[in-house]
């Protein structure tokens, strides 16, 4: 493919996972129920278990289930299927981010900045990206392009009022804390 930008891919040595081994039930930990994120492959033959780069990493890297070409330009975002469905624990959501190295090295941006997946969504996770570079980008199967973050939600009551208090040290404009 002439003029295309290819991402370097390190082959992941993983066998396709047994779907049943990925589904975990809630477990008891010292009298409390432990929440479990359940991950299910869309196609078990093309599934690679999401991984953390380090033990303390916040996000799980997701491996692409198939090759994708992202054309250059901002006319239409490219939809990329992540090959997984999830059952998200109650009180949580998932945030989908680009890996920082992908954004830096290949000039991709997510069309909506961050993908937010609600706990009641059960379909395949997808992301939409734009290619800001000068050439199409070829993403390879097993490439770590996106990462997912399990995010605890704070549900609050919303009250609509006619006015709000002025009791604050901040000004009333963006950037009001200084430059």
Task: List where the protein language model places each region.
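DUTPase catalytic domain/fold
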Residues: 1-179
